[in-house]
Amino acid sequence: MSRLIVKNLPPYLDEAGLKKHFSTVKDPKSAGFAPSDITDVKVVRARDGKTRRFGFVGFRSDETAEAAVKYFDTSFINSTKISVAVAMTFTDPNVPLSSRERKRQAAQRAREDAEDDREAKKARYLEKPMTIDDINGLGNASDPRLADYLDAMQVRSNAKTWANNDAGAVANEPQVIQSTASDDEYDEFTGKGDDEIDEDEDEEEESENKKDDDNEEAEEDEEDPVIEDGLAADPGVSDMDWLRQRQTRIKEGEPEEDRENRHTESKSEGKKGKGNAPKAATPVDEEPSEDPTIVSIRKTGRLFLRNLLYTAKEEDFRQLFSQYGELEEVHLPINTKTGQCKGFAHVQFEDPENAIAAYEAQDGKIFQGRLLHILPGKPKKDYNRLDEHDLKNLPLKKQQELKRKAEAAKQQFSWNSLYMNQDAVMESVAKSMGIKKSELIDPDSSDAAVKQALAEATVIGDVKSYFEKMGVDLASFDNKDRDDRVILVKNFPFGTTQPEIAEMFSEYGDLYKVMMPPAGTIAIVIFKHIPDARAAFAKLAFRRFKTSILYLEKGPKNLLPNEKMESDEVEHVKQDKIVTIEDKLSASDVMDTGSNDERPATASTSVFVKNLNFKTTSRVLTDAFKALDGFLVAQVKMKPDSKNKGKFLSMGFGFVEFSSKEAAEIAQKAMDGHVLDGHKLQLKISNRGQDEETTETKKAIDSKILIKNLPFEATKKDVQKLFGAFGSLKTVRVPKKFNSESRGFAFAEYVSAKEAEHAMSALQGTHLLGRRLVLQYAQADASNAEEEIERMQATVSKQAAQRSFADMKLAGEGKRRVDLEGEDEEEF
C-alpha cells in the first residue's frame, strides 16, 4: 500500500508539521524516496477539533511508501516517538471495528435476541392445546359468567327465564346507560345496515379460517366481546341501547367514501391495529433487490473517480483500469490556470460488466497514497449526437460525413501517418523547381503517374529530414499507441502557413508546439493538455478548410523522446522518454546514397543490466547511472503480479539508454560489477527494440524488394522507372494472371543491398495511381537445389498443419495448440 498511518503524534502537531517532518530527508538517494513523492497528509481530529494523535501520509508508489516506513518508523518529532506502518483500507478484513460500529452491531444483536425470544414464546403458546373455554375465559367453574352462559344455553322449554332476571339487573345496574335527551341526535343516523353486518360476519368467519400464524390475532378478536359483554349480558338493556353504544357519530356532509374509510379505520383500531395486518404482512418470497449502484453502472459502463492526486495523469488510470477490460475513454479534467488535475476523473468501459468488476475491486482502495472513491458515472453528454431517426432524414452524403466525423475520434491507428495531398505535393515540387504545376506533368506522357510518385517521394524525404532535425522520432509512427496531445494535420491546401494552423487550433487550448515542414504539406500540432486536444480533434476532424477537407490523426507516443512537455513533471517525463527502438535509422542515414554497405550509426544505445535486486526500482537505477555522460533514461522491467491485481513485480533486469554508443561503452566499463542494493550488476550492450526497417534490413541478405498493393493498371515499365531512380536494378518481375492482368504485387532486385535500402526508405508510403505502395524485403533466392527443397518442405508442412488445425476445429478440438510454422514436424 502507498498510504502510511502515523501513530502517537504530539497533540499540537498539524498537517503542515507532519508533512515537514516527512520531508526532512538528508539523502533521498539512500532513503529511496524524495519529498516530492508525498501526495497526501492528514491528521485525524475529533468532532471538537482536538487531534486524536494519529494521521496518514500518502506516497506516489508502494516502493516509496515502504522506504518511508523504514526511514521514519520509531523516529522522534521533538520528544515524541512516533510509530509508522502501512495503512489498511476499509475493505481489509483485518481492520478493527470502530466504537460506533461495535455499538451498532451490539444493538442489532440485542434486537435480534429479543425477536428470537418473542418467536419462541409464540411458538410455545401455539403448541399448547386450547379449548373454547380458555379462549372465552370460561374455564373457571366459580365464574358467575359460566352460570349465566349455561343458563342461556339451556333448551328454552326447560329454562326458567324469570329466575335470575332480578339478580342480573341488580348486578349489572351500574352498567345500564340511561336514555337522555341528548341521545335523540343519534336517531337521525342509522347504524350499520344488514349488508354491513353481514360483511362483518363474513370477515370474522374468514379470520377464523386463517392459518396458524394468525391464531394470535384470532384470539384477540375473540376476546373483544368478552371485554364489552357487560352491557350485552344485561337483560335490562334494550337492543336499541346496545346499538347506540356501537354507533359512530358522522359529520354532516361527509361523503360516503370517507364514511366507509373511517369505519374501516375504527374497526381496525378496535381490533388493536391488527384487523388488516395479516393481509399486508403475508410473507412473500421476493428476490433481494440489486444494489442501485451496480444497476447504474450496468446501464452506463462509466465510473466517476474522486479524491485523486492533482498531479495524476491519464496514463496512470489507464494502467490501473485496463486490467479489468477494454477502456473506451479516460477523461481527466484539467484546471486551465494550474495545468493540473481537478481531483476527479471519468473512466468509460466498453463492457459495463468490466466496469462493475473494476468498481468492486478498486472502490475504497489506496491509489497513489489516497483513498480512491468510485461512484457510478452519468452518461456522457453529446449534444451534437444524432440518433438513427435523425440521420434518416438527412441526405446520404451528409449521413456518411457525420458518421465519419464521429468515428474519427475513436480511431487509434492509420495506415499512412505521413499522407499528403497530391495536389499540394505537386505544387510544392513545382515551386521548388521554379516551374508551373502544368509543366511538371505532361498529360500526354505515359509515365505521368511515375513522375507524380517520384515527386511525392522527394517531398516525403524532405519532410522526414525536417522532422528529424526538430527531434521527432520517425520510427515512433510505426507504434500503435497514440498520444492524445499530438495531432497530425493533413490534406490542407498548398500555401497554408504555420500561423494559420496555430490560430485555428489555439481556439481550443494552449499549444505546446506547432511544426510544419517547408514543403507545407503536413503539420504536427502538440497541445499542453489532453482535454484541449480532444476538443480540437472532435471539432476540426473532416472540417472544410479553404478548398480542401482537413484529415486529422492522433500522433504516436514518444514523438519527441528527448523533450519533455511543460505540463508534465520531470519524473513522469523520464518514464515517457523511454525509447524502445535502439539502433534506429535517422533520416539523414536513410537518405544517404553512399556505396558503403555497413550498418548506419545508431542514434542511441541501450545497456542491458541484469542481476538486479527485486526491490530495486527505476528511480534507484536512474540515480546510479545519471552521473554518467550521455545518460538518457533507465528502466527496470516489470511484470504484472498475478496474485495482487494492479501491482507489478521486478523481473530482475533493466535497460539504461545513452545518447551514443561510445557513452554506452564507457558506462559498461565503469559500472560493470558495481554493487547496487546488495547485488553485483552485470552489464552488456543491448540490441533490443529495433524498428521494423532495421529488422527487415538484417533479414535481407539479398537486395530484393517485394512491392505490395500495386495497382492493376501498373506495368513492368512503370515499376522500372519508379524504382530505377534510386539505384541500378538487376531484375523486375510483375506476376500476371492467366488473362495477362497484374496480380497486384511485384519484385524489384537491385545490384547492391545499399541501393535496395535507399529505395525502401524513400518510397515507403508513396502512392502510385492512387494506391499506397507497401514495401518489404523479399526472401532471398535459394543458392542451391537443397535449400530450395527445404523451403518447399517447410511450405508443405505449414499447409498440412493448417489443414489439420481446420479439421480439429470442425471436430471441436480447436483449442488445441498446433505448430503452424512446422518447426517440430517430422522431415520428409
From Swiss-Prot:
Gene3D superfamilies: 3.30.70.330. Pfam families: RRM_1 (PF00076). Residues 195-207, 214-227 have a biased composition (Acidic residues). SMART domains: RRM. GO terms for biological process: rRNA processing. The keyword rRNA processing applies. Its main location: nucleus. Residues 241-272 have a biased composition (Basic and acidic residues). The keyword Magnesium does not apply. PROSITE patterns: RRM. One of its GO terms (molecular function) is RNA binding. GO terms for cellular component: nuclear speck; nucleolus; ribonucleoprotein complex. Residues 97-125, 166-293 are annotated as: Disordered. Residues 2-89, 301-379, 485-557, 605-688, 703-780 form the RRM domain. InterPro entries: Nucleotide-bd_a/b_plait_sf, RBD_domain_sf, RBM, RRM_dom. Keywords: Nucleus, Repeat, Ribonucleoprotein, RNA-binding, rRNA processing. It is found in: Nucleus. Involved in pre-rRNA processing. Belongs to the RRM MRD1 family. This is Multiple RNA-binding domain-containing protein 1.
